[in-house]
Amino acid sequence: SLNIIKMANVSISIAVLSTGNELKEPWQKASNEEIYNCNSFAIIAQLNEKGFNATYCGVIPDNLEKSIDFINSLKKYDVIITSGGISMGDADFMAEAFLKNGLEVAFHGVNVKPGRPIMMGKMDSSLVICLPGNPLTAMVNINLFVIPMLKKLQGENAFYHGYIKAINQSSFKTINGRVNIVLGRVQNGNFYVTDENKYGAGMITALYKSNSILVTNASTSNIESTQEVKILDLNVIYF
Protein backbone atom coordinates (compact mmCIF):
# COMPACT_ATOMS: atom_id res chain seq x y z
CA SER A 1 0.00 0.00 0.00
CA LEU A 2 3.05 2.27 0.41
CA ASN A 3 4.27 1.49 -3.13
CA ILE A 4 7.60 0.23 -1.76
CA ILE A 5 9.07 -2.51 -3.92
CA LYS A 6 12.45 -3.01 -2.25
CA MET A 7 14.23 -1.50 0.75
CA ALA A 8 17.52 0.14 -0.20
CA ASN A 9 20.71 -0.93 1.58
CA VAL A 10 22.48 1.79 3.54
CA SER A 11 26.20 2.27 2.94
CA ILE A 12 27.93 2.67 6.31
CA SER A 13 31.27 4.40 6.89
CA ILE A 14 33.83 2.30 8.76
CA ALA A 15 37.07 3.47 10.41
CA VAL A 16 39.79 0.84 10.94
CA LEU A 17 42.83 1.44 13.14
CA SER A 18 45.40 -0.33 15.30
CA THR A 19 47.12 0.54 18.55
CA GLY A 20 50.62 -0.05 19.89
CA ASN A 21 54.02 1.64 20.04
CA GLU A 22 55.56 -1.56 18.70
CA LEU A 23 53.74 -1.34 15.36
CA LYS A 24 55.35 -0.31 12.09
CA GLU A 25 53.56 0.19 8.80
CA PRO A 26 54.31 -2.31 6.00
CA TRP A 27 56.31 0.34 4.10
CA GLN A 28 58.47 1.14 7.16
CA LYS A 29 61.49 -0.76 8.48
CA ALA A 30 60.90 -2.66 11.73
CA SER A 31 63.52 -3.55 14.34
CA ASN A 32 63.66 -6.86 16.20
CA GLU A 33 61.51 -5.33 18.96
CA GLU A 34 58.84 -4.09 16.53
CA ILE A 35 56.16 -5.82 14.47
CA TYR A 36 54.37 -4.90 11.28
CA ASN A 37 50.81 -3.63 11.38
CA CYS A 38 49.11 -6.41 9.46
CA ASN A 39 45.79 -6.35 11.34
CA SER A 40 44.31 -3.16 9.91
CA PHE A 41 45.07 -4.08 6.32
CA ALA A 42 43.83 -7.65 6.76
CA ILE A 43 40.60 -6.36 8.34
CA ILE A 44 40.06 -3.84 5.54
CA ALA A 45 40.68 -6.54 2.92
CA GLN A 46 38.07 -8.77 4.59
CA LEU A 47 35.54 -5.94 4.77
CA ASN A 48 36.13 -4.82 1.19
CA GLU A 49 35.68 -8.40 0.00
CA LYS A 50 32.26 -8.43 1.69
CA GLY A 51 31.26 -5.14 0.06
CA PHE A 52 31.90 -2.68 2.90
CA ASN A 53 33.54 0.73 2.63
CA ALA A 54 36.39 0.81 5.18
CA THR A 55 38.95 3.58 5.73
CA TYR A 56 42.38 3.08 7.30
CA CYS A 57 42.90 5.70 10.03
CA GLY A 58 46.39 4.83 11.31
CA VAL A 59 47.98 3.61 14.55
CA ILE A 60 47.26 5.00 18.02
CA PRO A 61 50.32 5.04 20.32
CA ASP A 62 50.14 3.50 23.79
CA ASN A 63 49.34 6.79 25.49
CA LEU A 64 46.04 7.53 27.22
CA GLU A 65 45.72 11.23 26.37
CA LYS A 66 46.68 10.70 22.72
CA SER A 67 44.24 7.79 22.51
CA ILE A 68 41.41 9.96 23.89
CA ASP A 69 42.06 12.72 21.34
CA PHE A 70 42.44 10.29 18.45
CA ILE A 71 39.18 8.49 19.26
CA ASN A 72 37.32 11.79 19.57
CA SER A 73 38.28 12.57 15.96
CA LEU A 74 36.62 9.36 14.73
CA LYS A 75 33.06 10.11 15.85
CA LYS A 76 32.04 11.04 12.30
CA TYR A 77 32.18 7.35 11.31
CA ASP A 78 29.23 5.00 11.65
CA VAL A 79 31.49 2.16 12.83
CA ILE A 80 34.92 2.25 14.50
CA ILE A 81 36.98 -0.97 14.47
CA THR A 82 40.23 -1.18 16.45
CA SER A 83 42.69 -3.99 17.12
CA GLY A 84 44.85 -4.26 20.22
CA GLY A 85 44.92 -2.38 23.50
CA ILE A 86 41.96 -3.97 25.28
CA SER A 87 43.68 -6.71 27.29
CA MET A 88 44.82 -6.33 30.89
CA GLY A 89 48.33 -5.04 30.11
CA ASP A 90 49.68 -1.88 31.73
CA ALA A 91 49.88 -0.14 28.35
CA ASP A 92 46.42 -1.14 27.13
CA PHE A 93 44.51 2.14 27.18
CA MET A 94 41.83 1.63 24.53
CA ALA A 95 38.94 0.71 26.83
CA GLU A 96 39.61 3.67 29.13
CA ALA A 97 40.07 6.05 26.20
CA PHE A 98 36.72 5.03 24.72
CA LEU A 99 35.02 5.39 28.09
CA LYS A 100 36.42 8.92 28.40
CA ASN A 101 34.73 9.63 25.05
CA GLY A 102 31.34 8.48 26.33
CA LEU A 103 31.34 4.84 25.23
CA GLU A 104 28.43 2.77 26.55
CA VAL A 105 29.84 -0.76 26.74
CA ALA A 106 27.59 -3.60 25.60
CA PHE A 107 30.11 -6.29 26.59
CA HIS A 108 33.85 -6.65 27.20
CA GLY A 109 35.20 -10.17 26.68
CA VAL A 110 33.62 -13.39 25.42
CA ASN A 111 34.07 -17.00 26.52
CA VAL A 112 35.80 -17.96 23.28
CA LYS A 113 39.24 -19.47 22.58
CA PRO A 114 40.92 -17.88 20.73
CA GLY A 115 39.31 -14.43 20.66
CA ARG A 116 38.37 -13.63 24.25
CA PRO A 117 39.52 -9.95 24.30
CA ILE A 118 36.75 -8.18 22.37
CA MET A 119 34.68 -5.16 23.33
CA MET A 120 31.61 -3.64 21.69
CA GLY A 121 29.47 -0.65 22.51
CA LYS A 122 27.94 2.64 21.36
CA MET A 123 29.71 6.01 21.42
CA ASP A 124 27.36 8.82 20.46
CA SER A 125 26.06 7.60 17.07
CA SER A 126 29.07 5.34 16.37
CA LEU A 127 29.19 1.56 16.85
CA VAL A 128 32.53 0.66 18.46
CA ILE A 129 34.17 -2.74 17.94
CA CYS A 130 37.50 -3.39 19.69
CA LEU A 131 39.26 -6.56 18.53
CA PRO A 132 42.25 -8.46 19.97
CA GLY A 133 45.74 -7.44 18.91
CA ASN A 134 46.84 -10.93 17.89
CA PRO A 135 46.28 -11.35 14.13
CA LEU A 136 44.66 -14.78 14.22
CA THR A 137 42.15 -13.87 16.93
CA ALA A 138 41.35 -10.54 15.29
CA MET A 139 40.50 -12.25 12.00
CA VAL A 140 38.48 -14.98 13.71
CA ASN A 141 36.40 -12.36 15.50
CA ILE A 142 35.91 -10.39 12.28
CA ASN A 143 34.34 -13.44 10.69
CA LEU A 144 32.36 -14.64 13.70
CA PHE A 145 31.00 -11.39 15.10
CA VAL A 146 31.74 -8.32 13.01
CA ILE A 147 30.76 -9.14 9.43
CA PRO A 148 27.27 -10.46 10.35
CA MET A 149 26.68 -7.36 12.50
CA LEU A 150 27.78 -5.00 9.74
CA LYS A 151 25.60 -6.79 7.20
CA LYS A 152 22.57 -6.27 9.41
CA LEU A 153 23.54 -2.67 10.13
CA GLN A 154 23.85 -2.00 6.40
CA GLY A 155 20.31 -3.25 5.84
CA GLU A 156 21.06 -6.61 4.25
CA ASN A 157 18.56 -9.42 4.75
CA ALA A 158 21.17 -12.21 4.71
CA PHE A 159 23.46 -11.89 7.73
CA TYR A 160 23.30 -15.26 9.55
CA HIS A 161 26.26 -17.62 9.21
CA GLY A 162 25.67 -20.52 6.85
CA TYR A 163 26.79 -23.83 8.37
CA ILE A 164 27.53 -27.10 6.62
CA LYS A 165 27.99 -30.60 8.03
CA ALA A 166 31.23 -32.52 7.57
CA ILE A 167 32.98 -35.62 8.89
CA ASN A 168 36.00 -34.91 11.08
CA GLN A 169 39.03 -36.86 9.87
CA SER A 170 41.35 -36.87 12.90
CA SER A 171 40.70 -36.60 16.64
CA PHE A 172 41.94 -33.56 18.57
CA LYS A 173 41.53 -31.98 21.99
CA THR A 174 39.77 -28.73 22.90
CA ILE A 175 39.62 -26.67 26.11
CA ASN A 176 36.68 -27.61 28.32
CA GLY A 177 34.79 -24.63 29.72
CA ARG A 178 35.40 -22.40 26.69
CA VAL A 179 33.79 -22.20 23.28
CA ASN A 180 36.66 -23.34 21.05
CA ILE A 181 37.23 -21.90 17.59
CA VAL A 182 38.98 -24.61 15.57
CA LEU A 183 40.47 -23.83 12.17
CA GLY A 184 40.53 -26.40 9.41
CA ARG A 185 39.79 -27.25 5.80
CA VAL A 186 36.64 -28.75 4.35
CA GLN A 187 37.09 -30.88 1.27
CA ASN A 188 34.56 -33.28 -0.26
CA GLY A 189 32.46 -33.29 2.90
CA ASN A 190 35.40 -33.98 5.21
CA PHE A 191 36.91 -31.67 7.87
CA TYR A 192 40.69 -31.63 8.32
CA VAL A 193 41.81 -29.78 11.45
CA THR A 194 44.70 -27.35 10.95
CA ASP A 195 48.00 -28.30 12.64
CA GLU A 196 46.26 -30.68 15.09
CA ASN A 197 44.60 -27.60 16.65
CA LYS A 198 48.00 -26.56 18.02
CA TYR A 199 48.82 -23.00 17.01
CA GLY A 200 49.30 -19.68 18.74
CA ALA A 201 47.02 -16.64 18.60
CA GLY A 202 49.53 -14.78 16.45
CA MET A 203 50.15 -17.52 13.87
CA ILE A 204 48.55 -16.17 10.71
CA THR A 205 49.85 -19.18 8.76
CA ALA A 206 47.06 -21.21 10.39
CA LEU A 207 44.55 -18.88 8.71
CA TYR A 208 46.27 -19.31 5.35
CA LYS A 209 45.93 -23.09 5.64
CA SER A 210 42.22 -22.97 6.56
CA ASN A 211 38.95 -22.36 4.75
CA SER A 212 36.53 -23.11 7.58
CA ILE A 213 35.87 -22.88 11.32
CA LEU A 214 34.48 -25.44 13.75
CA VAL A 215 32.75 -23.87 16.76
CA THR A 216 32.47 -26.21 19.77
CA ASN A 217 30.22 -26.13 22.81
CA ALA A 218 31.81 -24.97 26.07
CA SER A 219 31.38 -28.49 27.48
CA THR A 220 33.41 -30.15 24.70
CA SER A 221 36.90 -31.43 25.54
CA ASN A 222 37.70 -33.39 22.38
CA ILE A 223 36.44 -34.06 18.87
CA GLU A 224 36.63 -37.67 17.70
CA SER A 225 37.65 -38.98 14.30
CA THR A 226 34.63 -39.79 12.05
CA GLN A 227 32.45 -37.51 14.23
CA GLU A 228 29.95 -35.39 12.31
CA VAL A 229 30.55 -31.70 12.99
CA LYS A 230 28.94 -28.39 12.04
CA ILE A 231 31.31 -26.17 10.11
CA LEU A 232 31.28 -22.47 9.31
CA ASP A 233 32.56 -22.21 5.75
CA LEU A 234 34.47 -18.93 5.45
CA ASN A 235 33.39 -18.65 1.81
CA VAL A 236 29.74 -19.54 2.32
CA ILE A 237 26.81 -17.31 1.49
CA TYR A 238 25.05 -15.69 4.47
CA PHE A 239 21.38 -16.43 5.14
Predicted features by range, described:
Residues V16-T19, T82-S83, N111, L131-P132:
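Short beta-strand segments
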Residues S1-Y56, I213, D233-I237:
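Short, glycine/charged-enriched hinge/interface segments at domain edges or termini
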Residues V16, L47, I81, G184, ...:
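Residue-level signal for inorganic ion chemistry
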Residues Q28-A30, D92-E96, I142-L144:
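Short amphipathic alpha-helical segments
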Residues I44-K100:
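N-terminal small/polar loop signature for handling phosphorylated ligands or for N-terminal nucleophile
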Residues A97-F239:
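Flexible glycine/proline-rich
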Residues I35-S40, I60-K66, H108-P117:
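A general structural motif
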Residues S1, I80, Q227-K230:
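Generic structural signal for buried aliphatic residues
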